[in-house]
């Protein structure tokens, strides 16, 4: 299935320092429009996000999941279904293979889903991270800034 791989903080929601509190959630209206258009065009929506706040001890995986569930509920109110969220909990200096722009999260998705790679796309707010991730997995990239 064609898939939209989309970043979270700064792309779907306003980036706050280590977002993890549901009361801090602000979803960009243009991101909702974009997600709706891709979903209407038959794309599966998967979030791929770096969450170094977990590795730094600023918040727990449980808090991350609570924030994610809250965001997903808000998106569902707009008819948007997020199929999955893949995240890297590591700090940049941990040199893992899952922190974007590394491709480990993409490999995880491919283990779990059948992806029509030629028809898929990456959307994010940072060319040096999300764009480089897209280039490494050989997918087109769309920059979304608010």
Swiss-Prot record:
Annotated binding of Zn(2+), by residue: 88, 90, 96, 98
Site (Contributes to substrate recognition) residue list: 99
Cofactor annotation: Mg(2+); Zn(2+)
Biological-process GO terms, alphabetical: carbohydrate metabolic process
EC number(s) reported in the record: 3.1.3.-
Annotated site, Stabilizes the phosphoryl group, chain positions: 49, 100
Active site: 7 (nucleophile), 9 (proton donor)
Residues the record lists as binding substrate: 7-9, 15-18, 49-52, 99-100
InterPro entries listed in its UniProt record: HAD-like_sf, HAD-SF_hydro_IIIA, HAD_sf, Heptose_bisP_phosphatase, Histidinol-phos, PNK3P
SUPFAM superfamilies per UniProt: HAD-like (SSF56784)
Catalyzed reaction equations: D-glycero-D-manno-heptose 1,7-bisphosphate + H2O = D-glycero-D-manno-heptose 1-phosphate + phosphate
First-tier enzyme category under EC: hydrolase
Keywords per UniProt: Carbohydrate metabolism, Cytoplasm, Hydrolase, Magnesium, Metal-binding, Zinc
Protein residues bound to Mg(2+): 7, 9, 125
Subcellular location: Cytoplasm
Top-level lineage group: Archaea
A cellular component term, taken from the record's GO annotations: cytoplasm
Gene Ontology molecular-function annotations: D-glycero-beta-D-manno-heptose 1,7-bisphosphate 7-phosphatase activity; magnesium ion binding; zinc ion binding
Predominant location: cytoplasm
Pfam families referenced in this protein's UniProt entry, alphabetically: PNK3P (PF08645)
Subunit structure: Monomer.
Record-stated family: Belongs to the GmhB family.
Protein's name in the database: Probable D-glycero-D-manno-heptose-1,7-bisphosphate 7-phosphatase
Species whose genome carries this gene: Thermoplasma volcanium (strain ATCC 51530 / DSM 4299 / JCM 9571 / NBRC 15438 / GSS1)
The encoding gene: gmhB
């Amino acid at each position: 299935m064609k898939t939209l791989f989309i970043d979270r903080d700064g792309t779907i929601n306003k980036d706050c320092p280590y977002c993890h509190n549901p009361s801090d959630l602000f979803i960009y209206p243009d991101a909702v429009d974009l997600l709706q258009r891709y979903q209407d065009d038959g794309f599966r929506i998967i979030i791929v996000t770096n969450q170094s706040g977990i590795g730094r001890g600023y918040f727990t995986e449980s808090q991350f999941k609570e924030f994610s569930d809250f965001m997903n509920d808000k998106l569902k109110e707009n008819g948007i279904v997020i199929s999955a969220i893949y995240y890297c909990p590591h700090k940049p200096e941990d040199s893992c293979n899952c922190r974007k722009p590394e491709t480990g999260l993409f490999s995880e998705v491919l283990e779990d889903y059948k992806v029509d790679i030629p028809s898929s796309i990456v959307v994010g707010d940072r060319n040096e991270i999300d764009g480089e991730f897209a280039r490494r997995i050989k997918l087109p990239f769309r920059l979304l800034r608010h």
